């Protein structure tokens, strides 16, 4: 977080612009604490401002992501995904003699690595290459053949409706192709205003039976 709220002792104002100061040093790697976003989200690293920003997850509190989503059970506004309390993540940072930095993401709840084949890699030039910018290549996910949307009439009221649908399948297992959320569009049959709702996907769920609770992942080979 490098916003007007988080200037720390550097102070606020045009003479104390923390972003402009950090942009003079593209090799900076700024890590934000007190963060609850999921480390599976590829956007947890960003270089679009001219330096590297990383959010480091939560060790033992709860997941909380961006606003604009709804709870899939109640339909109310939600920033916390389902079972958000199943959260314990962190980072292992390796710094090499040539100046290269590799950041490995860990799930402490299961003792496993998060995208183990995709460590975030920052060269000695830092953010100049903007590898982790706003625009990153990805391939759309697909729903299974014959997939359809279900409609639960028993749970339908004058201002709400319950729908079900099968999970989509990502194009592959790479981080940029992770399915982050679903957007549901509903338009009245006889015309009227279209309603849009979004809900988080369960991409942050650890695989059942993998690892041990509270364990640190086995050391990666160098």
Where are these regions (language model features)?
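Short, solvent-exposed loop/turn segments at conserved positions within beta-propeller repeat blades
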Residues: 84-86, 176-179
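Extracellular ectodomain segments of secreted/surface proteins
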Residues: 131-157, 172
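Binuclear metal-dependent phosphoesterase catalytic core
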Residues: 39-143
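Recognizes extended acidic, P/S/T-rich segments that occur
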Residues: 167, 177-222
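A short, structured loop/turn motif at beta-sheet edges
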Residues: 94-100, 156-159, 188-193
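Conserved aromatic anchor
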Residues: 158-178
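Ser/Thr- and Asn-enriched, surface-exposed coil loops between beta-strands
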Residues: 153-162, 219-221
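Active-site-proximal segments of metal-dependent phosphoesterases and phosphodiesterases across multiple
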Residues: 1-32, 39-48, 214-218
């Amino acid at each position: 977080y490098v916003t007007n709220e988080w200037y720390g002792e550097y102070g606020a104002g045009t003479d104390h612009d923390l972003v402009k100061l950090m942009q003079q040093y593209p090799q900076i790697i700024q890590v934000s604490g007190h963060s609850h976003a999921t480390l599976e989200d590829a956007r947890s690293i960003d270089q679009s401002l001219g330096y590297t920003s990383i959010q480091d997850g939560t060790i033992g509190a709860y997941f909380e992501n961006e606003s604009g989503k709804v709870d899939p059970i109640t339909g109310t506004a939600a920033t916390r995904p389902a079972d958000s309390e199943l959260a314990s993540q962190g980072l292992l940072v390796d710094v090499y003699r040539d100046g290269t930095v590799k950041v490995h993401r860990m799930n402490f709840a299961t003792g496993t690595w998060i995208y183990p084949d995709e460590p975030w890699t920052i060269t000695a030039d830092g953010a100049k290459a903007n590898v982790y910018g706003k625009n990153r290549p990805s391939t759309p996910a697909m729903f299974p053949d014959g997939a359809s949307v279900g409609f639960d009439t028993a749970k339908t009221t004058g201002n709400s409706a319950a729908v079900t649908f099968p999970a989509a399948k990502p194009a592959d297992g790479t981080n940029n192709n992770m399915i982050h959320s679903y957007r549901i569009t509903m338009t009245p049959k006889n015309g009227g205003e279209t309603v849009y709702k979004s809900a988080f996907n369960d991409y942050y769920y650890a695989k059942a039976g993998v690892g041990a609770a509270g364990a640190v992942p086995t050391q990666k080979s160098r």
